[in-house]
């Protein structure tokens, strides 16, 4: 499930980092089982809905380091840039304007790269 949502390159990089860190290796294994093996794999919500909920939760929690990867995942799952924008704007009412503004800034490069790639122009990532 993790590879399906986040993509091979992200997962390969994260697994290599976890393998190189004996202190947090067990925690990473636990987090992956709970997140991808139990939560994202449950019935009842489709992956697009789970992805939008994740963007909201990360925005409310101020977890900007995870937002870009999950925006990229949302786009991979067929969520449109407009749906991402509306999700972040909706979250602003609950997370606060500064948190939402920071979320927009964190997500903008991923959405821009996606739109650029869809338009046929070379994809540019910062």
Q: Which functions belong to the PLM regions below?
A:
Residues 51, 97-98:
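Substrate/cofactor-recognition hotspot
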Residues 9, 64, 98:
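Gly/Ser/Thr-rich beta-alpha loop segments that engage phosphate groups in nucleotides
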Residues 31-35, 52-59, 87-92:
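Short alpha-helical scaffolding segments that buttress acidic/His motifs in well-ordered protein cores
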Residues 93-94, 111:
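Short Asp/Glu-rich motifs
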Residues 52, 56-85:
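Mid-chain, well-packed structural core segment of small domains
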Residues 1-47, 76, 102-126:
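Acidic, glycine/proline-rich low-complexity segments that act as flexible tails and inter-domain linkers
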